A protein has these predicted regions:
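Basic, alpha-helical terminal appendages of large translation-related enzymes
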Residues: 1-56, 284-287, 297, 356, ...
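Residue patterns forming the tRNA-binding/recognition surfaces of aminoacyl-tRNA synthetases
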Residues: 11-19, 25-28, 34-35, 39-43, ...
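Conserved oxyanion/phosphate-binding beta-strand-loop segments in alpha/beta enzyme cores
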Residues: 12, 16-60, 90-99, 121-132, ...
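NTP-handling and nucleic-acid-processing catalytic cores
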Residues: 28, 32-37, 85, 158-377, ...
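N-terminal catalytic cores of NTP/NDP-binding nucleotidyl/phosphoryl-transfer enzymes
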Residues: 48-118, 147-162, 269-270, 274, ...
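Helix-rich, typically C-terminal accessory recognition domains appended to large enzymatic cores
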Residues: 103, 168-182, 432-463, 628-798, ...
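Conserved phosphate/anionic-ligand binding catalytic regions in large, soluble enzymes, centered on
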Residues: 265-286, 441, 447-449, 453, ...
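Alpha-helical recognition segments enriched in aromatics with Gly/Pro capping
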Residues: 328-334, 338-351, 380, 504-650
Length: 837
């Protein structure tokens, strides 16, 4: 079926409201909203088109997780902003892709299943239906034919396919490592999902526990992830947060030889100039040296065990710096001095190398540790003026090198750093290096409701492991599921409880987990992917959602990518955006996408608070349901109010009573459409204000400054309402201008003005700059320096005309009566003054 992009509007405008038909102060029948929504759907008004030679705009919302609670009024704020831009750009003759879908895997549905016994798939579908109903009621111009959910079988297939691309590149690998185990959720959490030692979701305690995990090597692209932010039109705060999370540091890696001739202890430091002040070395409890020593030293073994239960935050924030001596020493790389090794939990095994050279004179943590354990402090950086007094606390600023040998002493900190790195390189014990705070992404989850990881392993067994016979899985030989066997689907399951087995509930589904091929037994991976997986690439699938042969075609990707406008909450400033950029850059390096970045422009809508100024939540009882607002005032009123509350990015409290202001504006626009007269002449003042309004609204919409655009349209509508004879042209322009923000009202007014076509693809109004210029000004008329009247006069009026108009004022005549005008002062546009005696 071919859609007509200029389908005829409904045959008749909605009849005037019957008594009682209006709601919330709306003076016209709100049935027009359902009417126009049905029209758009019936005529496929917003089905995506891609015309040769036309420019495109890809407008995308961060798609929602369909929770059971549905939307509250804060959610549609960003959706309204993106919809305004999609509608606006269609009227500017762009081809627009504006889709919507559902981030539908995740813990909440699984936890609900554990509590109620209802399968996550059932609750997810019910929640999606409710969300979709709410979004449709608000008149958003989504192309629903491209709707997708990350739980769709066809979508899961391609998510797994991308994982295998990462696996093929060595960017997805297994690692036995300490992870954040949350027994309450029965899964491993990423560092980003933990707040103050508790799970972000549910607030359950988190402990460190060694576990086999799938990890994505995001650090391999750390440099690009940081550097390539520069070309993006993103909020500066978001880019700063991403750079901080990546944490690029320039410094040096230094190798300390162990006394016994074993493997060097390597450390990274940004202050190589302080190397001569190192008095001991600290390794994390997870470090290989600590593990080796712990095999024969009970004190070290006990300390390692105690540390295992602490979170990274607990370890780094503790004021008392605990630790135990390892009983071994390392050799200073330049002096040959022996430095004792300590095991301490303020060093984290997954940060850097898991070891630090301790310079207590110039590092606060090292200073505290040295003070607690009686270790020496050696100052090697003096104040910039050369002062080097005994220290009562660590001196961490730049200064001048001292006590560092003749080749380094006297050098300022930057030069001292370079010199020490040079000396290390000559000795073969170090080199300049860039390090990152960013750690590789722990990707696996021990849960049910997620994409199965498409990997299997060889199994050794003398029986049938599906029947409970003994078996052994060789996890050292991961094999990718062949592409033709994708997707690996989840098995049906009734018991979703994770239990005490860190492998998760899928490990209990023996008929699914184990299978035979070519006479051999194999075991599927029982870990699933995190909720982040589906949201890492959904923007690509929207470009080609019906493709069963590819995740997307090269033609579709080139036609639509990158996303031109991405709208979503600032809470995703780091995680989702960083992960999606990582996947995209891998795909780019494989030649599977044509752009280096997925999202060109990013906008964060500000949070809408409850009327009490607090974040909306059920516990506070301050949640406002958009269904109630739409029922009482209509979708257009809600859209206009949310955009009129203040700047899009600002945090704003919801005040239902203030909707009345935009309702008055709606009523005025509707009333103007009823009385517009095609035969009435367009006066100069009205024409000028019309062009000024088109100019201002156009600039404001381009800048996503919707509150000021609405304000200007209110000014214009007030002017039009005051005209005795109302021409049709300015009302038509107003209907077009208001339509992206209040689309039902815009369509209805357009039809009332005699147009048969929907205005969805009508050209956006143009303004004439020359007609925006004010030709008249209001000037004060003075008599002997005191203002006695005001007159309206052409800005460039001649002196004779100005004198005649000013003198004609009754009040001016009063103060000139009986006096002789000695002088007339006139500066066009500025001063009119009679000097009289």
């Amino acid at each position: 079926m071919q859609r007509s992009f200029r389908a005829a509007a409904p045959a008749e405008a909605a009849a005037p409201p019957a008594a009682g038909a209006s709601k919330g102060g709306v003076a016209y029948d709100l049935a027009i909203e359902a009417k126009w929504q049905a029209h758009w759907e019936a005529h496929r008004t917003f089905a995506t088109r891609r015309r040769e030679g036309k420019q495109k705009k890809y407008v995308l919302d961060m798609f929602p997780y369909p929770s059971g609670a549905g939307l509250h009024v804060g959610h549609p704020e960003g959706y309204t902003a993106s919809d305004i831009m999609a509608r606006y750009w269609r009227m500017r003759d762009y081809d627009v892709l504006h889709p919507m879908g559902w981030d539908s895997f995740g813990l909440p549905a699984e936890q609900h299943a554990m509590n109620t016994g209802t399968h996550p798939e059932v609750t997810t579908k019910e929640n999606i239906a409710n969300f979709k109903r709410q979004l449709r009621s608000l008149g958003f111009s989504y192309d629903w034919e491209r709707e997708l959910a990350t739980t769709d079988v066809g979508y899961v297939k391609w998510t797994q396919w991308i994982f295998l691309k990462l696996f093929e590149q060595g960017l997805a690998f297994q690692d036995e490592k300490p992870v954040n185990w949350c027994a309450g959720l029965g899964t491993v959490l990423a560092n980003e999902e933990i707040i103050d030692g508790l799970s972000e979701r549910g607030g359950f305690p988190v402990e460190r526990k060694p576990l086999r995990q799938w990890v994505l090597k995001i650090t391999a692209l750390a440099d690009r992830l940081a550097a390539e932010l520069d070309g993006l039109d993103w909020p500066e705060g978001t880019m700063t947060m991403q750079r901080s999370w990546i944490g690029r540091s320039e410094g040096a890696e230094i190798a300390f030889a162990t006394e016994g001739g074993g493997e060097d202890v390597r450390v990274f430091t940004t202050r190589a100039d302080t190397l001569m002040g190192a008095t001991y070395v600290v390794v994390a409890p997870e470090h290989p040296l600590a593990r080796r020593v712990g095999e024969s030293d009970s004190a070290v073994a006990k300390y390692i065990a105690e540390t295992a239960s602490k979170s990274d935050l607990d370890r780094t924030s503790a004021k008392a710096k605990s630790g135990v001596p390892a009983g071994e020493s390392v050799v200073h790389p330049l002096t040959g001095e022996r430095l004792p090794v300590w095991v301490a939990d303020y060093v984290i095994g997954s940060y850097g190398t898991g070891a630090v050279m301790a310079v207590p004179a110039h590092d606060e943590r090292d200073f505290d540790f040295a003070a607690a354990h009686g270790l020496p402090v050696k100052r090697v950086v003096a104040e910039p003026d050369g002062a080097a007094e005994a220290l009562e606390e660590a001196f961490t600023e730049h200064g001048v090198a001292v006590n560092s040998g003749p080749l380094v002493d006297g050098l300022a900190t930057p030069e001292a750093k370079a010199k020490v790195v040079e000396l290390l390189a000559e000795a073969g014990r170090g080199s300049a290096k860039v390090s990152y705070k960013l750690r590789d992404w722990v990707f696996s989850r021990q849960r049910y409701w997620g994409e199965p990881i498409p990997i299997y392993f060889p199994v050794t067994t003398d029986g049938d492991p599906r029947k409970g016979d003994a078996y052994s899985i060789d996890y050292s030989q991961p094999l990718p599921v062949p592409e033709e066997e994708l997707p690996v689907a989840l098995p049906e399951l009734e018991d979703f409880q994770p239990g005490d087995d860190p492998q998760g509930c899928l490990a209990r589904v023996l008929d699914w987990r184990f299978f035979q091929r070519d006479g051999k037994w194999w075991a599927r991976e029982t870990n699933t992917m995190p909720q982040w997986a589906g949201s890492c690439w959904y923007y690509l699938r929207f470009a080609d959602p019906a493709n069963t042969q590819q995740a997307w075609s090269a033609e579709a990707e080139k036609a639509w990518l990158p996303v031109d406008l991405y709208v979503g909450g600032a809470e995703h400033a780091v995680l989702h955006l960083l992960y999606a950029r990582f996947w995209h850059k891998v795909l780019h390096s494989l030649g599977l996408v044509s752009t280096a970045e997925p999202f060109q422009k990013l906008v964060h809508q500000g949070m809408i608070l409850g009327a009490d100024g607090e974040k909306m939540s059920k516990s506070r009882g301050n949640v406002i349901n958009p269904d109630d607002i739409v029922s009482a005032y209509g979708a257009d009123a809600m859209r206009l109010y949310e955009m009129f509350m203040g700047p899009l990015e600002a945090v704003k409290p919801w005040q239902t009573e203030q909707i009345a202001g935009v309702v008055r504006f709606q009523n005025r626009v509707h009333a103007l459409a009823t009385r517009a007269d095609g035969s009435a002449e367009l006066g100069d003042e009205t024409e000028r204000l019309m062009h000024q309004t088109i100019k201002k609204v156009t600039a404001d919409v381009d800048a996503l400054s919707f509150n000021t655009a609405i304000s200007q349209m209110m000014i214009f509508s007030n002017h039009l309402a005051g005209l005795k004879q109302l021409p049709a042209e300015p009302v038509e322009k107003l209907a077009l201008l208001v339509s992206p923000l209040a689309p039902h009202l815009g369509e209805e007014a357009w039809q009332m003005l005699g147009h048969e076509q929907s205005l969805a693809y009508e050209p956006w109004p143009e303004y004439d700059e020359a007609k925006c210029v004010e030709t008249d000004v209001v000037m004060a008329v003075q008599v002997n320096g005191k203002v006695r009247a005001e007159i309206k006069i052409a800005k460039d009026a001649a002196e004779a005309e100005a004198r005649e108009l000013a003198a004609a004022s009754e009040n001016v005549q009063k103060f000139l009566d009986g006096k002789e005008v000695k002088k007339f002062i006139y500066v066009p546009g500025r001063i009119i003054n009679f000097v009289a005696k």
